[in-house]
């Protein structure tokens, strides 16, 4: 979405960026994931000779854009309050079971500005509770809509998530903030987010404001941050936002940039921005497997075949990886994909004089033959969900 206003920017690797300022990369935010996991094998009566092991294991999930169009939040309004509890109910068991769940919130939450759902995105603060209830732990705010309600909106959005017990990355409220590091079952996981641009609104900022609060794809700074993350953490995850919207395959710029991130030290790259899913790639570096998904698509939005004539915009994926740390070395040991589909059902309520809808993110595997929810939807809907499952997996083409 959006246009770009040219100002005092430089071009770096094809992206508009501000002149580089000294980047704060020393601050480490560390917290403990909520789930408990046995981290050490001990001798048992049945196996008295079991040697001790220092292996630590963590499961991490990540998903695509949470995009609250006006009809999405408008449909959740009953005249007095907003209720988003249905949005993620079906994916909650999967997301909440992860040791670390990463979400991508695209837009702002700023009660001092009007609600908006395109081309400016400003959602009600009530969306946070449904995101938290689904089991998400951290939210990526590095995207082209984070300045939609100004620097004030950026700060309010970040602080609102933090106030509700969720961490954020990809922006800074305070210039002294550094790399987010989550300690997950004894494994230190660094998480970084970068955006290709900010819809031209960045032209209204001073250089100081820009450098104090935003992470763009200035590759010199990206390299510096990834290398620093590798020094202070066991495992590095990067969520870049770039690419061509609604294209099912990455641009050469995405390929080059994400490969460079792996070369600099990223272990996993979870891409976003195109609003559709794009393929995956497994890279072997120094004998270890690294993983890229070029785009995770949308998790929740009003984009779909009925609104855009593009069926891929209603399809998403929850990536599910396992990492292990043993003898001081942390590796990626498994990668799974869980395709999703956005259900939109008309409800007995109006929005701006038109229909309103109940939105739910369905976990497509539940509707496959033999799945627990196979017989809970009509035939046409079932075919749409099953096609999403099959075609998403085919496009992702995971080879790990």
Feature names for model-found ranges:
Residues 2-14:
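Hydrophobic membrane-insertion alpha-helices, especially the h-region
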Residues 12-32, 36-400:
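Acidic, metal/ion-coordinating pockets
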């Amino acid at each position: 979405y959006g246009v770009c206003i040219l100002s005092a920017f430089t071009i770096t690797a094809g992206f508009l960026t501000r002149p580089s300022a000294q980047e704060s990369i020393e601050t480490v935010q560390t917290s403990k994931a909520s789930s408990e996991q046995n981290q050490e094998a001990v001798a048992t009566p049945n196996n008295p000779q079991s040697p001790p092991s220092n292996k630590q294991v963590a499961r991490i999930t990540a998903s695509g854009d949470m995009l609250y169009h006006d009809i999405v939040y408008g449909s959740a309004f009953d005249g007095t309050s907003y209720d988003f509890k249905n949005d993620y109910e079906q994916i909650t068991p999967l997301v909440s079971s992860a040791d670390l769940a990463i979400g991508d919130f695209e837009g702002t939450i700023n009660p001092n500005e009007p609600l908006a759902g395109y081309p400016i995105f400003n959602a009600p603060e009530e969306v946070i509770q449904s995101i938290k209830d689904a089991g998400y732990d951290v939210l990526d705010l590095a995207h082209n809509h984070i300045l939609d309600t100004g620097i004030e909106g950026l700060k309010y959005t970040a602080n609102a998530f933090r106030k509700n017990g969720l961490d954020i990355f990809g922006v800074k409220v305070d210039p002294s903030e550094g790399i987010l590091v989550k300690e997950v079952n004894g494994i230190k996981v660094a998480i970084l987010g970068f955006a290709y641009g900010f819809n031209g609104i960045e032209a209204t900022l001073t250089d100081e404001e820009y450098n104090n609060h935003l992470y763009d794809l200035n590759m010199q700074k990206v390299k510096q941050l990834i290398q620093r993350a590798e020094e202070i953490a066991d495992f590095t995850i990067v969520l870049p936002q770039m690419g061509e919207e609604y294209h099912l395959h990455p641009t050469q710029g995405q390929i080059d940039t994400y490969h460079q991130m792996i070369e600099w030290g990223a272990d996993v790259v979870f891409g976003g921005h195109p609003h559709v899913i794009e393929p995956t790639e497994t890279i072997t570096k120094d004998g270890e497997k690294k993983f890229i998904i070029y785009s995770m698509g949308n998790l929740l939005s009003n984009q779909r075949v009925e609104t855009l004539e593009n069926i891929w915009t209603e399809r998403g994926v929850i990536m599910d990886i396992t990492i292990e740390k043993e003898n001081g070395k942390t590796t990626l040991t498994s990668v799974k994909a869980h395709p999703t589909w956005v259900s939109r059902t008309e409800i007995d309520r109006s929005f701006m004089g038109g229909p309103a809808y109940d939105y739910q993110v369905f976990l497509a595997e539940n509707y496959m033959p033999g799945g627990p929810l196979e017989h809970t939807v009509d035939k046409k809907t079932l075919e749409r969900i099953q096609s999403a499952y099959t075609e998403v997996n085919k496009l992702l083409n995971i080879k790990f």
